[in-house]
Amino acid sequence: MALIKRVHGIMPEFGENCYLAENATVVGQVKMGDQCSVWFNAVVRGDVNFIRMGKKVNVQDGAIIHCTYQKFGTTIGNNVSIGHNAIVHGCVIEPNVLIGMGAIVMDNVHVGSNSIVAAGSVVLENTIIEPGSIYAGVPA
């Protein structure tokens, strides 16, 4: 069974038909929409701020979703896929986005809808990705 923990008195909330792998971790101020999935070794850690996930968000194996203390929560729109071993931190990801395997999305980034962040890319703090874009590289 997945590790689901209360942090600072706040327990994660889950929509209908969500799947959590046996060793996934979801803690604190996390709210998931319907039909989300969090796969093996993934961590969704709302310990120092909020994490809001829309419907049909897919968090692949080893991915980390976190937030920034007293600065930035993390908001993820509907139909988003977070690739294996990606890190998503204190940012906004609009609907219909793919965050590629091993990509890093840093604080205060805004990823527009229908965009792709390519595998292994690093999106630096305060970057605004326009809707329908493909971002790749280090830095992207």
Residue positions per predicted region:
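Glycine-rich hexapeptide-repeat left-handed beta-helix
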Residues: 1-14, 19, 41, 47-68, ...
